[in-house]
């Protein structure tokens, strides 16, 4: 932490009135980060915490001290409850021994004076403060779900819609601060607190300062190493642009799993920051990479303003959920963008097919409404998929789920856990071997993905099954498939709803999606080879063709999860493939570099081992599945 700008004479601690009403909304604890993020100027470890009861010596009001929420260089933060009103707070406890010197006390006064008058939905609310002979107590809004650092520690990476959700709130709070002439100077995951209803609040104003003209700015280096801007390290002063830089580091950390300039050595980290030396993973969407590249620029003048950031394609063309589920604190949420056309169509189809007809209901009125919504469905079919299919896109797609799972299949979580358990059991006990055991002589034909196209930067993920059925998992979570004979269209508005239409009777609201599906089919037919020599299976022989529930791309492979429990992993480098199917017993099909395919019983692999080539891919598949598991 940094001493307050300037040295003022010590003065008595002002005392704020104790509120008679609870603070608006739940609110945050103190500085708590899952990684070791030492502040550049930090004091020694705080002494032992105070007793269980905190008493205001002037008013006599008492508070029960609860659990520790977080700790920093100068203070600890606890949950505290007013014994009379029952209102819960986060109380920041600063030992008097830490503010014995005038400049130390001035620092705390500066924090209080900057924070106490801030009133904004995305700023931690300051309630009141007092002191006794042992400590200074600052009472703040309590955020029951801790900080974004805790979510990041549990999740490691977040989806782009989640990152947009949190960044919009951070930008809102930061814009308010800058408009009031306040610089935060320590924006990091541990200082973004999450309320009970999943709202974000910017907190911890221990390093905050008033904005000064460039020539009058203090040159002190302050902040957290991984998030410090290059001009701060070069002692050029701290302006609003340095907060924007820190925000870019936060965005990168949430999307990529680690800060952009993090190294094992602090000096090396600072060198990377000064030289703006970092990498942008290809797995990020193009707008995300463009925004990060715009923010993380060496010159403060070249960085975008908050308004420009909010107008960037990353925010304007990407889906931002209105609210995140609480489960997203620990596991990947199932996010489905709203689609007015789909919602109305689901309502109409339910009216037409899903229940008894109401004699008093005018069905033609609803049908007219559906036809009017055709332009709402996303976009026109691409003029040339060849030119755009290689564009980078979102690394993940998921079919919408109503919570009950696919009616005749499994949920994503069930598929992941079943495959994870079976594969872990196989790999863990597999003895060393140099070659594969004998494959099954006549394995049952299986349905697998023979071709695929990732066009999710605009439309969705297209694939062709070995049965010649072609399908698209659209970005809005809907799924549409074309039968092998190209005469029937299958539409899944959610994972629990399924409708079939003849080609000539597809509703107008679905025509744009059908157009995109047909373009995908045409492109794959004309430009892609079948991915392996496996026995084909006729679609008529498949009672319920599997539905793609989720796909995930990494820098090495593509993972696909299906409603019948099938798991397929395609490796980019050598075009090998791994398919897990059957389950009773589990079958492992390996498509080699020469496109030849062999199917093995997983139990045989466990007993006899397999070649290093196959073992390596089984282990990578296991790692991919672990990454998708909420456990």
Swiss-Prot record:
Keyword Lyase: no
Keyword vocabulary terms for this entry: Apoptosis, ATP-binding, Cell cycle, Cytoplasm, Cytoskeleton, DNA damage, Golgi apparatus, Kinase, Nucleotide-binding, Nucleus, Phosphoprotein, Repeat, Serine/threonine-protein kinase, Transferase
Reaction equation(s) it catalyzes: L-seryl-[protein] + ATP = O-phospho-L-seryl-[protein] + ADP + H(+); L-threonyl-[protein] + ATP = O-phospho-L-threonyl-[protein] + ADP + H(+)
Main subcellular localisation: cytoplasm
CC annotations in GO: centrosome; chromatin; cytoplasm; Golgi stack; nucleolus; nucleus
Record domain POLO box: where: 448-526, 547-630
Domain Protein kinase: 63-315
PTM text: Phosphorylated in an ATM-dependent manner following DNA damage. Phosphorylated as cells enter mitosis and dephosphorylated as cells exit mitosis.
EC annotation from Swiss-Prot or TrEMBL: 2.7.11.21
Compositionally skewed regions (Pro residues) per UniProt: 20-31
Region Disordered, residue ranges: 1-59
Induction info: Negatively regulated by TTP family members: TTP binds to the 3'-untranslated region (3'-UTR) of PLK3 mRNAs, contributing to the rapid degradation of transcripts.
Binding of ATP, residues: 69-77, 92
Localisation: Cytoplasm; Nucleus; Nucleus, Nucleolus; Golgi apparatus
Function in brief: Serine/threonine-protein kinase involved in cell cycle regulation, response to stress and Golgi disassembly. Polo-like kinases act by binding and phosphorylating proteins that are already phosphorylated on a specific motif recognized by the POLO box domains. Phosphorylates ATF2, BCL2L1, CDC25A, CDC25C, CHEK2, HIF1A, JUN, p53/TP53, p73/TP73, PTEN, TOP2A and VRK1. Involved in cell cycle regulation: required for entry into S phase and cytokinesis. Phosphorylates BCL2L1, leading to regulate the G2 checkpoint and progression to cytokinesis during mitosis.
Subunit-level organization: Interacts (via the POLO-box domain) with CIB1; leading to inhibit PLK3 kinase activity. Interacts with GOLGB1.
Name of protein: Serine/threonine-protein kinase PLK3
Organism expressing this protein natively: Mus musculus (Mouse)
UniProt gene name: Plk3
């Amino acid at each position: 932490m940094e001493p307050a700008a300037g040295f003022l004479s010590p003065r008595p601690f002002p005392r704020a009135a104790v509120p008679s009403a609870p603070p608006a909304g739940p609110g945050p604890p103190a500085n708590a980060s899952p990684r070791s993020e030492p502040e550049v100027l930090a004091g020694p470890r705080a002494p032992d915490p105070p007793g269980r009861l905190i008493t205001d010596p002037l008013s006599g009001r008492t508070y029960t001290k609860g659990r520790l929420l977080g700790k920093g260089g100068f203070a600890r933060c606890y949950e505290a409850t007013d014994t009379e009103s029952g209102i819960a707070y986060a109380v920041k406890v600063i030992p008097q021994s830490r503010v014995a010197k005038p400049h130390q006390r001035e620092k705390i006064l500066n924090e209080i004076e900057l924070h106490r008058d801030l009133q904004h939905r995305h700023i931690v609310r300051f309630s009141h403060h007092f002191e006794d002979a042992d400590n200074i107590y600052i009472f703040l809004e309590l955020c029951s779900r801790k900080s974004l650092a805790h979510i990041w520690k549990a999740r490691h990476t977040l989806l782009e819609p989640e990152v947009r959700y949190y960044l919009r709130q951070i930008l809102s709070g930061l814009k308010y601060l800058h408009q009031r002439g306040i610089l935060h100077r320590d924006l990091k995951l541990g200082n973004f607190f999450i309320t009970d209803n999943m709202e974000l609040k910017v907190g911890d104003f221990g390093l905050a300062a008033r904005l000064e003209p460039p020539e009058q700015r203090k040159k002190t280096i302050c902040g957290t190493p991984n998030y410090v801007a290059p001009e701060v390290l070069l002692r050029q002063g701290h302006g609003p642009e340095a907060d924007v830089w820190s925000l870019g580091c936060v965005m990168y950390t949430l999307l990529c799993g680690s800060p952009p300039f993090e190294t094992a050595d602090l000096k090396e980290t600072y060198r990377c920051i000064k030289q703006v030396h970092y990498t942008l993973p290809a797995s990020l969407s193009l707008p995300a990479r463009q925004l990060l590249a715009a923010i993380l620029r060496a010159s403060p003048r070249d960085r975008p303003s908050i308004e420009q950031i909010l107008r960037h394609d990353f925010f304007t063309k990407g889906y931002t959920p209105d609210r995140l589920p609480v489960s997203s604190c620990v596991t990947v949420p199932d996010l489905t963008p709203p689609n007015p056309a789909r919602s109305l169509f689901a309502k109409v189809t339910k009216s037409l097919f899903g229940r008894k007809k109401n004699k008093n209901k005018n069905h033609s009125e609803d049908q007219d409404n559906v036809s009017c919504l055709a332009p709402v469905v996303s976009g026109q079919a691409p003029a040339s998929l060849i030119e755009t299919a290689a564009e980078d896109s979102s690394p993940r797609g998921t079919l919408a789920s109503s919570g009950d799972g696919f009616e005749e299949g499994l949920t994503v979580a069930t598929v992941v856990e079943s495959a994870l358990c079976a594969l872990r059991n196989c790999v863990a006990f597999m003895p060393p071997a140099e070659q594969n055991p004998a494959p099954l002589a006549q394995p049952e034909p299986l349905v697998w993905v023979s071709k695929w196209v990732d066009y999710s930067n605009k439309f969705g993920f297209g694939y062709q099954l070995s049965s010649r059925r072609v399908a698209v998992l659209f970005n809005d979570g809907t799924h549409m498939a074309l039968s092998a004979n190209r005469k029937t269209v299958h539409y899944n508005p959610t994972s629990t709803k399924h409708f079939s239409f003849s080609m000539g009777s597809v509703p107008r609201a679905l025509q744009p999606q059908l157009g995109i599906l047909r373009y995908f089919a045409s492109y794959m037919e004309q430009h892609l080879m079948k991915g392996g020599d496996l026995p084909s299976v006729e679609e008529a022989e498949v009672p319920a063709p599997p539905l793609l529930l989720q796909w995930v791309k990494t820098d090495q492979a593509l993972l696909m999860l299906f409603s019948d429990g099938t798991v397929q992993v395609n490796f980019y480098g050598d075009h090998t493939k791994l398919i897990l199917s059957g389950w009773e017993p589990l079958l492992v099909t390996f498509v080699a570099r020469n496109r030849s395919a062999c199917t093995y019983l997983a139990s045989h692999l466990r007993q006899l081992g397999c070649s290093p080539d196959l073992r390596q891919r089984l282990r990578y598949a296991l790692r991919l599945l672990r990454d998708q598991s909420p456990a």
